[in-house]
Amino acid sequence: SHGLSDDELEIMLNKARETGLLNKAFFYVWDEPTKTNEYEQIKTLSDRIHRYAPEAKVLTTFYCGPTDGEHKDDLFAVFDILNGATSIYCTGVWALQDNENRSKQCKAKLKSGQEWWSYVCMSNTPGLASNSTAIGNRATMWRNYKEQNSGFLYWVVNGFASVYPLRPRPELPEGDGILIYPGESFGTNKICTSVRLERWRDGAEDYDMLVLYEKKLGRSAALSLLNNVYKSPSNYTDQSKYALALRKNLIENITE
């Protein structure tokens, strides 16, 4: 159940609205539901929030359809089951099965005011764990641009089992949930970023520049340019020179 009383929840939501934060926030009430009763609990939690703030956005992450009930194994049924309770549907890329048509199906299920996001975790490729190459880290956002997600979620950036001594969680793939490191282990009092995070940043910058390129020359032209380095989640360049050429081309066309 929610940790706040009704009065506390109402006060928090009113304060968020008054300070202009409510339209920037989303409520993450459940992680990766798989069963019918879990969807019902999401509806209950969402109803409680919407009682005091009908405009509040609730985000739900999921990587599969229900594992029970009449919609068993139907990924796209989640959009119908949670209609009204969720405004941001965030699918794990594992559920998309390297099939861009499934991304199109997700977008087609959206109703007015709803958004479709995606997330990577575990050993997804392209992704952010250590099994992805540096270009794979970058291609995470190339994929987002091509498949037209309106948001990207990553579950945690400092998911250590312990900090003293510094240890990752043994049940997770190497690098999953760890994008930054405490500086003490590396002789500094500042946070240290991973190379994987820096390459993801490059991809996020590419994404922003592709959007600017699209506004100037059209989406078809932007996709044609992206196609030089990225065709699908299982078919993208492994040569950094082509990634750099993409960046150079984007900058030249945006600024001329």
Label each region the model flagged:
Residues 1-2, 7-38, 42, 46-65, ...:
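Catalytic domains of carbohydrate-active enzymes that cleave complex glycans
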Residues 1-163:
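Catalytic-core regions of glycoside hydrolase
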